């Protein structure tokens, strides 16, 4: 659930999987990089791009999810995660699904924020849920989080199998903030459409800050080498176009899938039925098979209730739709 934290102006984001107050245990460093995105919006892809720049090549000192942990995730003791980060001598880059209004913005830190067409993110999460070992997730969560601090299951038992179309309708209509105790809302654990656009909105209103930069899944698909140059510039890391082209070959979906045991998140935690299936296809437009004409119309009505036109254009098409530098 989301609520105002009494000690700061941050919003508190707590669910079965994450607690943004875990950030209080970490001392940030000058030059740290925080990568934030809604689920299934290109965060792992961005971590891989940043890793290629930080290490100037494809090799990693360990699994990506250990080198660049999801700090908020409640399946590892925070002391263990912080100790790993404190021991790192390289420039740190840390994963979060927390919106920027749930983080303390530090002028010494770069915030790399990523978007994707919300419909594609929802389809991807639908498939990811089928690949996730929910029992294992719950065991890990309960081993870390005391009983009195645990959040209720992500959604109630509905008594019947739900079709993808039913899931999408709930996802489309759901509120920004789930009721207390629910943890997540549909779709299958992903935030609602309102949640996603809220998160992107927290970036959009801060996009002109010098240490906040926006990236988009569609732009990666269009020109991966060119997009690799953008975080290089933002992070002050020297890279030529030729070097970016060389590095980008290690960040294609096929390349990441071939090294899924290193690149996919949480591979050391046993939460996936298949590490390779985390990198399912990486395409766009699969949502069309689940949307009737009525859903199409409702979707466009709904998004215009939730966000301004410039944000919506960027959220759905990347810089082709609207350049956030404007």
UniProtKB/Swiss-Prot annotation:
A Pfam family reported for this protein in Swiss-Prot or TrEMBL: Sulfotransfer_1
Domain of life the protein comes from: Bacteria
Cellular component, GO, one term: cytoplasm
Disulfide bonds listed in the record: none
Key words of the record: Transferase
Keyword Transferase attached: yes
Its EC number(s): 2.8.2.-
Binding residues for 3'-phosphoadenylyl sulfate: 40-45, 116-124
Residue positions of the active site: 97 (proton acceptor)
GO molecular function: sulfotransferase activity
InterPro entries: P-loop_NTPase (IPR027417), Sulfotransferase_dom (IPR000863)
GO biological processes: sulfation; sulfolipid biosynthetic process
Function: Involved in the synthesis of cell wall sulfolipids with activity towards mycobacterial trehalose glycolipids and eukaryotic glycolipids such as glucosylceramide and galactosylceramide (type I and II) but not towards eukaryotic 3'-sulfate galactosylceramide.
Family to which the UniProt record says this protein belongs: Belongs to the sulfotransferase 1 family.
Protein name as annotated: Glycolipid sulfotransferase Rv1373
